[in-house]
């Protein structure tokens, strides 16, 4: 089976992934827009397995341990078969028995509004929410957060994500809060229909590799500790009021923000396609 984790950036999807991938039978892929892109391709592109492999490599944002040739070998079949095959290939690279993989988890914080291909599979969706004040505060601790340090821009950007989340059928999605981790895992596993067989006995998880390459994620593989309330307490009153006011202003705009979400999704896809072409040049 397949699971798709969606969230706004800096909302805890990587923490959730790190917790899930410890569970025996579950393989979590490094953050990738490949499932969304795969579901948007025409038949001509779908028939070019080398091109699909390049899109997978280019669309996976922490570098994937799967090589171009290994990815190409996974590109036969329908979307569901391809996405599951890539999970088994990753399990092999991580020294975990591929024949014991029962659930492959894909997550992204980018091409969030592109649901067509994902909905065509039998996969389920998991949406993780974090207190907006914590998400805003975190923009100042990562270089890629520079664009969202203005409260109003941040609020509109956030609501464009909520627009996308609302377009997923209710019976296909499970929503949880960052503050509910790790206790929410039991309910999540029940929703996914995944038996809890304990933890993998050996082998590294994908998030271990990600943490080695992304300095801002170096705490995800340690024991989970939620310090969000302390981080909120450090925000000055003026900032809190500005963010709350901006969020209140932007919330009624949510139903109208589909085009903004499509714009950002389109920019991500264009960048991925460009990188894929460079890989094959």
For every predicted segment, state its role.
Residues 1-4, 194-281:
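PAPS-dependent sulfotransferases, especially Golgi type II membrane carbohydrate sulfotransferases
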Residues 7:
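The Walker A (P-loop) glycine that initiates the GxxxxGKT/S ATP-binding motif of P-loop NTPases
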Residues 10-11:
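ATP-binding Walker
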Residues 14-26:
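A conserved segment at the C-terminal end of the G1
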Residues 23, 109, 250:
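Acidic-histidine catalytic/liganding microenvironments
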Residues 29-106, 112:
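PAPS-dependent sulfation machinery
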Residues 37-40, 135-141, 205-211:
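Short, charged, surface-exposed secondary-structure boundary motifs
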Residues 100-199:
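PAPS-dependent sulfotransferase catalytic domain
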């Amino acid at each position: 089976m397949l699971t798709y984790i969606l969230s706004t950036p800096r909302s805890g999807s990587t923490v959730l992934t790190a917790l899930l991938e410890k569970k025996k039978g579950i393989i979590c892929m490094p953050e990738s827009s490949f499932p969304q892109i795969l579901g948007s391709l025409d038949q001509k592109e779908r028939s070019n397995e080398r091109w699909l492999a390049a899109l997978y490599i280019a669309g996976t944002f922490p570098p994937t341990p799967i090589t171009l040739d290994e990815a190409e070998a996974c590109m036969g079949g329908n979307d569901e078969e391809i996405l599951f095959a890539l999970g088994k290939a990753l399990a092999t690279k991580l020294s975990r028995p591929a024949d014991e993989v029962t659930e492959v988890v894909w997550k992204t914080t980018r091409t969030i509004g592109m649901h067509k291909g994902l909905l065509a599979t039998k996969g389920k969706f998991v949406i993780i929410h974090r207190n907006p004040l914590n998400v805003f505060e975190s923009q100042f601790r990562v270089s890629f957060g520079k664009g969202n340090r203005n409260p109003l821009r941040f609020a509109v950007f956030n609501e464009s994500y909520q627009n996308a989340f609302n377009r997923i059928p209710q019976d296909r999605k499970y929503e949880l809060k960052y503050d509910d981790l790790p206790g929410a895992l039991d309910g999540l596993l029940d929703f996914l229909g995944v038996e809890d067989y304990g933890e993998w006995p050996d082998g590294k998880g994908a998030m271990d590799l990600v943490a080695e390459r992304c300095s801002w994620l170096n705490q995800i593989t340690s024991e989970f500790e939620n310090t969000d309330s302390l981080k909120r307490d450090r925000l000055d009153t003026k900032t809190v009021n500005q963010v709350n006011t901006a969020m209140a202003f932007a919330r009624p705009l949510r139903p109208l923000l589909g085009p903004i979400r499509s714009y950002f999704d389109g920019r991500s896809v264009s960048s991925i396609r460009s990188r894929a072409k460079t890989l094959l040049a």
